[in-house]
Each structure stands twice: as structure tokens, then as C-alpha cells.
Design a protein with these regions (language model features):
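Active-site gating/metal-coordination segments in enzymes
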Residues: 2-11, 70-178, 184-187, 200, ...
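Catalytic pocket-lining loop regions of alpha/beta-barrel enzymes
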Residues: 4, 146-281, 292, 310
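Short, well-ordered coil/turn segments that N-cap beta-strands
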Residues: 19-22, 51-55, 91-97, 122-126, ...
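Histidine-centered catalytic micro-motifs
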Residues: 22-33, 196-199
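Catalytic metal-binding/acid-base residues of hydrolase active sites
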Residues: 29, 62, 103, 133, ...
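Alpha-helical scaffold segments that flank or form the walls of functional sites
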Residues: 33-93
Length: 329
């Protein structure tokens, strides 16, 4: 992951568009790493940069784990840490919802661990992300290094089945060749809400570099198939990740919101067309996407590309879908 450069980001600064429009940012992280810090004060620096961020949702990032005890309980440390950093900051409900991590391959007994997360989050626990993103090519970075076919694994599904009785959702992080694997999971658990992170991970590096024209229609077809499942919603964002191959981080200056909107609209508009605004939510994915553009410019881009939607459709995209799916209001 590329570390964000604040001095570089300042080379492209813009006036905030429609600063009154309420936004729920449904995907950000917190971590304190030697080479890449993003703690509460950094998050607040972004959420206070001009847009009306009404509330946010934290998504697990393997940070602040417990250093001792059983492995399956170590992620509880992240939930505990994040809960301590949550609360009202000005007009923003920071971390109104928490998406944590458990290892579903532990099967049915993971239910007890889910109950511990729910208790540790003080009423803010909303779901689990157990990432399945992987590729056979070693040049593609894999978060958690999951095995092939994880979403079809019997033990994984045994653990996954513990979500619905607790009213919890599942955040899916995968790459575009795996979208149809999620389709199978969604059909097997039609009553469990599934949130697909970052538009399904259309890769643009390694063996996928320079093949955007070939990959895009394949991604479109698989996303259209996935959209047939009413329990699946999509986080619209994530194209600032280096793995998507847009290479904004290599430019002399960061992109403007107009440039960003033009480059990403084919992906984002396809998701909205197939899933509908009531099953799509704009996201920041900060600080990961911060390698490519600033928080203010990013939300300006979302506002530009959605300007032709109705007031109610835009309310869904910027706030209401996320607030409903994560049960924030």
C-alpha cells in the first residue's frame, strides 16, 4: 500500500461542492503503523475538510489486535480500540457502526466470538469482513492471504451462518475474477445482507495491467449477475487503490474532481444502473484511497457524477443506503 503524501495532495485543492448535502462515509479504517498512521485526529482532519459528514462506519484493518490469548479472540482488540475512539465529534457521529473480523473457518463456534464483539462495541457492532481477495499471480497483494475457494468452504459457510441470527451483515472484499464466487454465497444465504466493497475489485496491475478494455466488459457482466441478488449492495468507490491501476499516485499532481469523475464514472455508473441507488453507497476507503486523492476532491467527484440523479436518489447514494444497511438510524 502506498503511503499518502499530504504535501502532494495539497497541490490539488478545490472549493467544496454542495457542502450542506448529508453524507454517511460507510468505509474507513484506523491504524497506527510506523510508516502509515491514520488515527482519530487524521480521520477528523478529513471529515472536517468541508463536506457534511453526518456519520461514518469503521471497517476492520487488522489493527490494534490483542497481543496475547487465543488467536480467534485477538481481533477483539481492534473492536475495543475503535469503540473507544467513536462518538460525536462536532456534527459528525464518528464510527456510528463497526465492522470487525472473525475467522469464519472456525465454523459454528465462532458464534460465541461474535457475541463478544457485539458486547465490546457497545451497541455499534454491525457486521464482519472476512476478506477473500486473492489471485494466483504473486504480484497481486493479498490481504490475509486466503485460500482458493474460501467462500465455498463448508466450514466458512458454517461460520457465516452465525451472522443472520444476530442481525449482522457481511462485508465482502475480493477481486473481479471472484465476483461469481460471491454470487454463490449470496444465493446460499438470501436473508443475510452482503455489502460488496470497492465495486468488486477490478484489477489493473500485474497480469491485468494494460487490459482494461478486455477486463471491463467481463466485470460488467459479473456485476450484472451479482445484482440479481436483492440481499447484495455495493460500496461505490475504491478506485484510488494502487491495485486498480489508474496510477494517479504517480502523477505530478493529484487529479481534480472533474478528472476523477470522468475516469471512474464508467465503473460507478454501471453499479448504480444495475443495483439502483437504494443498493449503492458512495465510500471513501480512506486512508487507502488517500494515496491518490484528497477527501474533499473525492466527495466533489461523487457529487459531480451524480448531479443528474433526483434528490431522493442522491440521498440514497450519499447517506440513506449506508444508514439503512448498517442500521445507523
Amino acid at each position: 500500500m502506498v503511503t499518502p503524501r499530504e504535501d502532494w495532495l495539497k497541490l490539488t485543492e478545490e472549493e467544496t461542492l454542495e457542502p450542506e448535502l448529508p453524507i454517511c462515509d460507510p468505509h474507513h479504517h484506523l491504524w497506527d503503523r510506523p510508516d502509515n498512521r491514520y488515527i482519530l485526529e487524521d480521520l477528523l482532519g478529513d471529515t472536517n475538510s468541508g463536506h457534511n459528514i453526518a456519520r461514518t462506519v469503521f471497517v476492520e484493518a487488522s489493527s490494534e489486535y490483542r497481543r496475547s490469548g487465543p488467536d480467534e479472540l485477538k481481533p477483539l482488540g481492534e473492536t475495543e480500540y475503535v469503540h473507544k475512539n467513536s462518538g460525536l465529534q462536532g456534527n459528525t457521529d464518528i464510527i456510528a457502526g463497526i465492522v470487525g473480523h472473525v475467522d469464519f473457518t472456525l465454523g459454528e463456534r465462532i458464534g460465541e466470538v461474535l457475541d463478544m464483539h457485539i458486547e465490546a462495541a457497545g451497541g455499534k457492532f454491525r457486521g464482519i469482513r472476512h476478506a477473500s481477495a486473492r489471485d494466483d499471480d504473486s504480484s497481486i497483494p493479498a490481504y490475509r492471504k486466503p485460500p482458493r475457494g474460501l467462500l465455498s468452504d463448508a466450514k466458512f459457510r458454517e461460520g457465516f451462518a452465525q451472522l443472520q441470527p444476530r442481525g449482522l451483515s457481511y462485508d465482502a472484499w475480493l477481486f473481479h475474477p471472484q465476483i461469481l464466487e460471491l454470487n454463490g454465497l449470496a444465493k446460499a444465504f438470501p436473508d443475510t445482507p452482503i455489502i460488496l466493497d470497492h465495486i468488486g475489485g477490478p484489477l489493473g496491475i500485474g497480469p491485468y495491467a494494460g487490459k482494461r478494455d478486455e477486463i471491463f466488459p467481463m466485470w460488467q457482466a459479473d456485476m450484472a449477475t451479482l445484482a440479481e441478488n436483492p440481499n447484495v449492495v455495493v460500496k461505490v468507490g475504491g478506485c484510488g487503490m494502487v491495485t486498480y491501476g489508474f496510477d494517479w499516485h504517480k502523477q505530478e499532481r493529484p487529479p481534480t474532481s472533474q478528472q476523477l469523475a470522468e475516469r471512474t464514472a464508467p465503473y460507478y455508473m454501471w453499479c448504480i444502473e444495475k443495483f439502483g441507488p437504494d443498493r449503492c453507497m458512495f465510500e471513501s476507503n480512506f486512508p487507502v484511497d488517500k494515496a491518490s486523492y484528497s477527501y474533499n476532491v473525492m466527495w466533489n467527484a461523487f457529487k459531480r457524477m451524480s448531479k443528474d440523479f433526483s434528490t431522493s436518489e442522491r440521498a440514497s447514494l450519499f447517506h440513506d443506503t449506508a444508514a439503512r444497511v448498517y442500521r445507523l438510524i
